[in-house]
A protein has these predicted regions:
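Short, basic/aromatic beta-hairpin or loop at an interaction surface
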Residues: 27-38, 253-269
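Acidic, small/polar-enriched beta strand-loop surface segments
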Residues: 1-5, 159, 171-263, 275-308, ...
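Assembly/oligomerization scaffold segments
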Residues: 1-101
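Extracytoplasmic
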Residues: 2-4, 20-22, 33-37, 54-56, ...
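Short beta-strand-centered interaction patches in the first periplasmic/extracellular domains
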Residues: 91, 98-100, 135-202
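Short, conserved beta-turn/loop elements at beta-strand boundaries and strand-helix junctions
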Residues: 84-88, 304-312
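Amphipathic, non-transmembrane alpha-helical segments in extracytoplasmic/periplasmic proteins
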Residues: 38-40, 96, 110-134, 149-172, ...
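Glycine-rich, small/acidic residue-mixed loop/short-helix segments
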Residues: 313-325
Length: 325
């Protein structure tokens, strides 16, 4: 199988001009706001024109259609924000971040949100940044009695709220998306197809299973404005984790407790796979591993994907966790 790539810089296809100079391409896809990144390493012998910051790179990777069914799969748009040169041998490394993350999302704001649904809040924030909102059906009507945004960016606020309800939030292709974590949804909120990973596709595997989770229950607190008292909410039974945070209402406190308990459950198993390159795998995608052994066989949700093309071929590395119960 012959790896293939296509790179479009500022809407101009530059694939042929860099084909002979390419040393490697690495694309990292993370769930949530962690930030997707691109690294392109080029030979600089003889010297080429010094690259420019701010270039917009569209990247597609895959295999030759005559030898593999994948073809080229678009991996997104990236803005070059770092250029490195080293040697000998002389090489350039262009590093870029996904263009979806607008800088305005990082600017601090101070305001309060009262009597609003999570869907309406995300929609309002999206509109403020000239984006469209996509919120999972199970999250849209989640009621927020009160939340303060004090010298806090919209990015941090949304990440905080998503964590409280066991969700992930990510800007993709002009959308601001919030969907339940671990439910294998695409960036536009649609269900991702289940991808089967067979033993012959796996170059290396590593699974870690901790002895047992530390906690079987979570207690969170909320402030009752009528009684002026701090009330407790417990989810689960057994060894208890006690949250220090006090939430605005009982509903928010219970959702936060459920999300935290699920986090403890997910941390018991961690899977890493190195695969024959598969450009269709993405963060939050769901895979079914077959042909190995328990507890590796079965369903997993991808948290991180690294695609790499170099002189060794095309490989895909993934980190995954068990799906939501």
């Amino acid at each position: 199988m012959q790896p293939q790539f296509k790179i479009i810089a500022n809407q101009t296809d530059i694939t042929q001009s860099i084909q002979q100079r390419l040393i490697s391409i690495r694309i990292t896809d993370e769930s949530g706001f962690k930030g997707d990144t691109l690294d392109i390493k080029l030979d600089d012998e003889p010297p080429i024109e010094w690259p420019r910051h701010g270039a917009e790179l569209e990247v597609l990777i895959g295999f030759n259609k005559t030898t593999h069914n994948a073809g080229l799969v678009r991996q997104g748009l990236y803005i070059v924000d770092e250029i490195a040169h080293s040697g000998p041998p002389n090489t350039f490394t262009l590093r870029g971040k996904a263009s979806n993350l607008k800088q305005s999302l990082k600017q601090p704001k101070t305001r309060s949100w009262n009597e609003v649904t999570l869907g309406d809040l995300v929609n309002t924030v999206a509109q403020e940044h000239a984006m469209s909102a996509k919120v999972g059906e199970t999250l849209k009507d989640y009621a927020i009695a009160h939340v303060d945004q004090t010298d806090e960016s919209d990015l941090h606020l949304l990440t905080r709220l998503a964590r409280d309800v066991g969700a992930m939030v990510k800007p993709v292709a002009g959308y601001l998306v919030m969907v339940p974590r671990g439910e294998a949804k695409s960036a536009t909120g649609q269900s991702l197809p289940l991808m089967t990973i067979t033993a012959d596709q796996i170059k290396q595997h590593h699974v870690t299973q901790t002895e047992a989770r530390q906690y079987d229950a979570v207690i969170t607190y909320w402030h009752d404005t009528q009684t002026a008292k701090r009330e407790a909410v417990q989810v689960g039974e057994g060894r208890v984790f006690m949250s220090r945070h006090t939430y605005a209402d009982a509903t928010t406190a219970r959702s936060a407790a459920k999300a935290k308990l699920h986090q403890f459950k997910r941390s018991v198993l961690q899977l890493s796979l190195t695969l024959i390159g598969n450009p269709n795998l993405m963060a939050e995608g769901k895979i079914n591993v077959t042909g190995l052994r328990h507890p590796i066989n079965g369903s997993w949700v991808i948290e991180r994907v690294v695609h790499q093309i170099n002189d060794q071929g095309f490989t895909t590395r993934i980190d995954a966790v068990p799906p939501k119960d």
